[in-house]
């Protein structure tokens, strides 16, 4: 699946935006379909985050933080059903505020996974856009 991304402009500086991307008490406030979000230890490269999503009867994901550079960006990776997903956030200063870009890249390793990607790609793109717009609303609320 080709990667896709979405950007939002927020009227807050990167130092105020960045904590909302991974912190346990903040992510559930703007992420749809999220039942549980647990960070195992201090945030940083190698930290594991467990997400339980309410979609498809409930999906548990074990994500690993693979890049962590406050307040400029972070990345996570997880694998589910033969699909490896990397999500990257870039936070750039933009005037008095910030531009936040999230890029999602998924690679399938088997036939079944390759067949699933076209089915879920549209839903993932919509979710990414809606969640980032919700983040903007929460931050500027």
Model-identified regions with their sequence ranges:
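A short, structured loop/turn motif at beta-sheet edges
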Residues: 11-15, 42, 66-71, 90-99, ...
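Hydrophobic-ligand-binding modules of eukaryotic lipid transfer/binding families
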Residues: 1-8, 129, 133, 141
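Beta-strand/loop substructures that line and gate deep hydrophobic ligand-binding cavities in soluble
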Residues: 77-130, 135
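Short, hydrophobic/aromatic-rich segments at coil-to-beta transitions
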Residues: 42-50, 68-77
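Short, surface-exposed coil-to-beta transition loops
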Residues: 3-5, 58-63, 84-88
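Generic structural detector for well-ordered beta-strands
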Residues: 7-11, 38, 52, 64, ...
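Hydrophobic ligand-binding cavity/cleft-lining segments
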Residues: 1-40
